[in-house]
Amino acid sequence: MRVRRGLLRLPRRSLLAALFFFSLSSSLLYFVYVAPGIVNTYLFMMQAQGILIRDNMRTIGAQVYEQVVRSAYAKRNSSVNDSDYPLDLNHSETFLQTTTFLPEDFTYFANHTCPERLPSMKGPIDINMSEIGMDTIHELFSKDPAIKLGGHWKPSDCVPRWKVAILIPFRNRHEHLPVLLRHLIPMLQRQRLQFAFYVVEQVGTQPFNRAMLFNVGFQEAMKDLDWDCLVFHDVDHIPENDRNYYGCGQMPRHFATKLDKYMYLLPYNEFFGGVSGLTVEQFRKINGFPNAFWGWGGEDDDLWNRVQNAGYSVSRPEGDTGKYKSIPYHHRGEVQFLGRYALLRKSKERQGLDGLNNLNYFANITYDALYKNITVNLTPELAQVTEY
């Protein structure tokens, strides 16, 4: 009798264990789906931690090797004239890096092109992440008559090297936008760039489509001015260094290379998210962003593929110039796009079919003192893709 009861208990325990693990895995998958930003942040942090450990091990190995070589030379040179065996393992450190930024007494000429490395660009910026109302931001910048309606500004003491449209995808981040503008407007003014802000806001019930918003913003921005440089800027990314020049170049630019929530390390080499820049010519050549990425994730990886497929490489700022702080919880509430990997495998085939050339939309345009607001209700029917 006891043996029978034991046999009956075993399946029950196994069933309970199976139900427990099923419930746990289902809860985990649901969390990954509804809170992808948090999950991916932790995954990127773990990946960055692995990179940091690997780099530290390389550094330790190099230091040990250097110490062994020094000891060997020291023993050898104890009986030989030191001048016969010069030891200079740190010869590269003897050369001081000379600054390429112009001196404080640099003279501007109104008919000359603004330089890229100006004395007003000091480097690290004091970051203030505290919340601030848009009314306060309006009051702060209303003292500058050079800022025109919609946030248009250009220098008066030199000819701007680049005319830059700053495109910001937006949904329910009203507390983040004034924090970004508080830092970005003064930085761009110090860089002597002509610029304007375009906040592209998605309404409706569809999942957030960051890439399609960028395409809409591009089309609307080009109606205002013959911009030659485009900066695609997440609203929660605050630059920490004003020497991170927001002009464009011969190759597409990835500005946000070191984000605080990723331990200031690049999560992976193909990472192209946060803040990026392309010339208008480059953006048109790659057919813009893809429109098919509904939900969080994948569109910046597809942009990387498009850039590579078009024969470009990606440039990045050196050292700590590309450091950014991230306003927390930007992606909370945005669902994970589970179909992104299937689309990424077909990036090359889709590039000529999905982007600027299949984009349709209806925009409601309003003007703020500091930006142009472009409101759109996006649906998949507005950017249908033919078979490929």
Swiss-Prot record:
Identification of the protein by name: Beta-1,4-galactosyltransferase 5
Segments on the Cytoplasmic side according to the record's topology features: 1-14
Claim: Manganese is one of the keywords in the record: yes
Lumenal topological domain: 36-388
Domain of life: Eukaryota
Subunit structure and binding partners: (Microbial infection) Interacts with porcine reproductive and respiratory syndrome virus GP5.
GO cellular component terms, A-Z: Golgi apparatus; Golgi cisterna membrane
Family note: Belongs to the glycosyltransferase 7 family.
Catalytic activity: a beta-D-glucosyl-(1<->1')-N-acylsphing-4-enine + UDP-alpha-D-galactose = a beta-D-Gal-(1->4)-beta-D-Glc-(1<->1)-Cer(d18:1(4E)) + UDP + H(+)
Membrane topology listed for this record: Single-pass type II membrane protein
Named cofactor requirement(s): Mn(2+)
Induction and repression of expression: (Microbial infection) Up-regulated in response to porcine reproductive and respiratory syndrome viral infection.
Binding residue positions for UDP-alpha-D-galactose: P169, F170, R171, N172, R173, F208, N209, R210, V235, D236, Y264, W296, Y329, H330
Location of the protein in the cell: Golgi apparatus, Golgi stack membrane; Golgi apparatus
Stated role: Catalyzes the synthesis of lactosylceramide (LacCer) via the transfer of galactose from UDP-galactose to glucosylceramide (GlcCer). LacCer is the starting point in the biosynthesis of all gangliosides (membrane-bound glycosphingolipids) which play pivotal roles in the CNS including neuronal maturation and axonal and myelin formation. Plays a role in the glycosylation of BMPR1A and regulation of its protein stability. Essential for extraembryonic development during early embryogenesis. (Microbial infection) May play a role in the glycosylation of porcine reproductive and respiratory syndrome virus GP5 protein and may be involved in the regulation of viral proliferation.
A GO term for molecular function: metal ion binding
EC number: 2.4.1.-, 2.4.1.274
Listed InterPro entries: Galactosyl_T (IPR003859), Galactosyl_T_C (IPR027791), Galactosyl_T_N (IPR027995), Nucleotide-diphossugar_trans (IPR029044)
